[in-house]
Amino acid sequence: MAGGTLYTYPDNWRAYKPLIAAQYSGFPIKVASSAPEFQFGVTNKTPEFLKKFPLGKVPAFEGKDGFCLFESSAIAHYVGNDELRGTTRLHQAQVIQWVSFSDSHIVPPASAWVFPTLGIMQYNKQATEQAKEGIKTVLGVLDSHLQTRTFLVGERITLADITVTCSLLWLYKQVLEPSFRQPFGNVTRWFVTCVNQPEFRAVLGEVKLCDKMAQFDAKKFAEMQPKKETPKKEKPAKEPKKEKEEKKKAAPTPAPAPEDDLDESEKALAAEPKSKDPYAHLPKSSFIMDEFKRKYSNEDTLTVALPYFWEHFDKEGWSIWYAEYKFPEELTQAFMSCNLITGMFQRLDKLRKTGFASVILFGTNNNSSISGVWVFRGQDLAFTLSEDWQIDYESYNWRKLDSGSEECKTLVKEYFAWEGEFKNVGKPFNQGKIFK
């Protein structure tokens, strides 16, 4: 498996499909969803990106061999395995059937109903009621089909289950309250089964079904609309009559709306207000994290990246932490343990700009442990500073390191280089993951 890079923006439900498929197949996939690797609305409009992906849409996949692919279902098909695609011609056709069903019959009404509740789209009562009826219809079809089945196709999870689950995700999280979903118990049973599979949880985290149907909030909608500044009117200086006539003829052409080429889920991202920067109060630091990441990615760790790190590290503006997974007795197969690490990294995408970590799995199947070294902006444990970052961190014990101590220097060297004695662990190195 050559692997590749998935370009997307954070929390893009369409990107969940290939990411979950990759969890099942073991396909090595790197997510690029934040600067400097990828910045939505900027990178995807560059000539270089459009040459590879003419529509400029995400998710988009680029293999290490230069192979490029767009459309989330196609990417999921590519990174998946034969079991996910269907092991017989009949099953393969049925998988395609449910993927098409999802795109054609679930996504449109789901968007029309859910987006207004998120403040992304203006509320229209008639459109919302039609969407509710459309969702009742598709849930009825699914409920009948799942009455005697555990999964949509065959006896195991396939791309059909992954695709339909992702399309229903925001419905279950936002509007399908208990009374609405009650007639469709088979669908809910199947949905809960899917989202609680380790491969799904590694990407989605814990999925909580909504308790009360979310409603349109006019105030929230108004707040999420991009503000347009009205230029102040100034009295023009007297001009010759001829010039005035020419100005009337040359009326300015309005600039096209930047959202015109976005689909609804991308408009959601564009309309989403920027979260408050938890580090806005901190003085500017001399340590440039992005520059260190470039050194770490492109240069030798021991001879270039580590010397650069210690030469430029700002101990007043940054802190180094050691983390150890609390429940090693629950770790079984190595690949499942790695899913815990990669899943946490994927859900912490919004922390990448101001964070770096090397997390390592030690040991073997049924006898392993997870620990890592993290670097954060400021002196506090980053996860507590923003709701966007409060993900999985409570499953670890955290200890702040003294950056001037020999212990810290040894841990940073061993964990960043993935080599050393690791005396604090007592198990051999298995594999590591980098958060950057």
UniProtKB/Swiss-Prot annotation:
Record-level GO BP terms: translational elongation
One Pfam family from the record: EF1G
Cited InterPro entries: EF-GSTs, EF1B_G_C, EF1B_G_C_sf, Glutathione-S-Trfase_C-like, Glutathione-S-Trfase_C_sf, Glutathione_S-Trfase, Glutathione_S-Trfase_N, GST_C
Residue span(s) of domain EF-1-gamma C-terminal: 275-436
Any single Gene Ontology cellular-component annotation: cytoplasm
Entry GO MF terms: translation elongation factor activity
Entry comment on modification after translation: Phosphorylated by CDK1.
Region (Disordered): 221-278
Ranges where the GST N-terminal domain occurs: 2-87
Compositional bias (Basic and acidic residues): 221-249, 265-278
Keyword Phosphoprotein: yes
UniProt keyword Manganese, yes or no: no
Domain GST C-terminal: start-end pairs: 88-221
Keywords, comma-separated and alphabetical: Elongation factor, Phosphoprotein, Protein biosynthesis
Organism domain of life: Eukaryota
UniProt-listed SUPFAM superfamilies: eEF1-gamma domain (SSF89942), GST C-terminal domain-like (SSF47616), Thioredoxin-like (SSF52833)
Subunit-level organization: EF-1 is composed of four subunits: alpha, beta, delta, and gamma.
Record function comment: Probably plays a role in anchoring the complex to other cellular components.
Name of the featured protein: Elongation factor 1-gamma-A
Source organism per UniProt: Xenopus laevis (African clawed frog)
